[in-house]
Amino acid sequence: MTTDTLPVLAILGGTGDLGTGLARRWAQAGYRVIIGSRTADKAEAAVADLREVMAERGVAAVAVEAMENQAAAEAADIITLTVPFSHQASTLEQLKPALQGKILIDVTVPLVPPRVARVQLPEQGSAGQIAQEILGEEVAVVSAFQNVAAHHLQEGAGLDCDVLVCGNKKEARAEVIKLVEAAGMRGFHAGMINNAAAAEALTSVLITINKQYSCHAGIRITGLDHAE
């Protein structure tokens, strides 16, 4: 499968650790990836860094480019939002027209500093539900990747980590699971967007575990032997 037959991916807020980690993995898997940022300079710097990392890994060419968030959202088929919770709603309100008819992967975790190790879900239930309410039913919001350490994503090694994928449209969840697998992990249909609350809450639990045991913990789904 070539970049001509794969969906075009955009990562909004793609200059942070999580965004660059996903960009590296998807670009290496052969996807055309657009790194979006509020400023073109930051996006271009992230692209330059990604190309340098790919060269170090022996990957000769990758289809990656830099754009401001608006242009990135317009150009892509599937958009991933990796901005902090404090910027989620305003970013989605601004980009709502450009996202209509597309899949939005919402990676947002409603962390409230300084107590990020404490579960503090919003009144709406979850960040995923907030995204769906803002964008409307013409946008397939899919919640995923909340429980993956950015540190692991940026490395080139395999990932012993699973991803819970929540969204109201099964077909959209299936598309996101393909991207999870392209990034080197297992993805699981985890139900409607309301269930995103579970994955989002788990992040604070994992932060607590990471601090306690000096690790980068993830989650693993067990008991699947009978299905293989």
Q: Model regions: which residues?
A:
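NAD(P)+-binding Rossmann beta1-loop-alpha1 motif at the extreme N-terminus of oxidoreductases
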Residues: 2-52
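General beta-strand structural signal in soluble alpha/beta enzymes
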Residues: 66, 140-144, 188-190
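Hydrophobic Val/Ile/Leu positions in short beta-strands of Rossmann-like dinucleotide-binding domains
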Residues: 11-12, 81, 165
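Phosphate-coordination loops involved in phosphoryl transfer and adenosine-cofactor binding
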Residues: 5-8, 101, 160
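Rossmann-fold NAD(P)-binding glycine/threonine-rich loop
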Residues: 108-155
